[in-house]
Swiss-Prot record:
Taxonomic lineage of the native organism: Bacteria, Pseudomonadati, Pseudomonadota, Alphaproteobacteria, Rickettsiales
Protein family per UniProt: Belongs to the universal ribosomal protein uS11 family.
Name under which the protein is recorded: Small ribosomal subunit protein uS11
Function: Located on the platform of the 30S subunit, it bridges several disparate RNA helices of the 16S rRNA. Forms part of the Shine-Dalgarno cleft in the 70S ribosome.
GO function terms (MF aspect): rRNA binding; structural constituent of ribosome
Protein source organism: Neorickettsia sennetsu (strain ATCC VR-367 / Miyayama)
SS bond partners: none
Oligomeric and partner information: Part of the 30S ribosomal subunit. Interacts with proteins S7 and S18. Binds to IF-3.
Family matches, as InterPro entries: Ribosomal_uS11, Ribosomal_uS11_bac-type, Ribosomal_uS11_CS, Ribosomal_uS11_sf
Keyword annotations of the record: Ribonucleoprotein, Ribosomal protein, RNA-binding, rRNA-binding
Chain's gene name: rpsK
Record's GO cellular component terms: ribonucleoprotein complex; ribosome
């Protein structure tokens, strides 16, 4: 019989792009305990990059992780889209305690040349 896994604290990695929202929760060794994206929750196309999609991704993942005993989170945010505030608000409202919040958005120090601008 399989033993039930149980964790009390973990790390939440919230990755917000302009097209999608991914959240994965790991334990302190880096083993993934649960994940969700706006596509896996059921949104398609342009609806994947809305604040409501980010909120529903966070709430479905937090309810899944509460069942295995998660109570404390370190949150790592990545991405400059304002949608990440909705995901963070949903994590905060789920009842799981956030002890640290880190912004891991990569910022270039004048790296490679940007792509050409799109003309619409």
């Amino acid at each position: 019989m399989r033993e039930k896994k149980s964790i009390v604290s973990g790390n939440a990695h919230v990755i917000v792009t302009f097209n999608n929202v991914y959240i994965s929760v790991t334990d302190h060794q880096g083993n993934v305990q649960g994940w969700a994206s706006s596509g896996s929750v059921g949104f398609k196309g342009n609806k994947k990059s809305t604040a409501y999609a980010a909120q529903s991704v966070a709430t479905t993942l937090m309810t899944k992780l509460k069942r295995i005993g998660l109570k404390i989170l370190n949150v790592h945010l990545s991405g400059s889209n304002p949608i990440r505030e909705a995901a963070l608000r949903a994590i905060r409202n789920s009842g799981i305690v956030i002890i640290s919040l880190q912004d891991m958005t990569p910022v270039p120090h004048n790296g490679v040349r940007l792509r050409r601008r799109r003309r619409v």
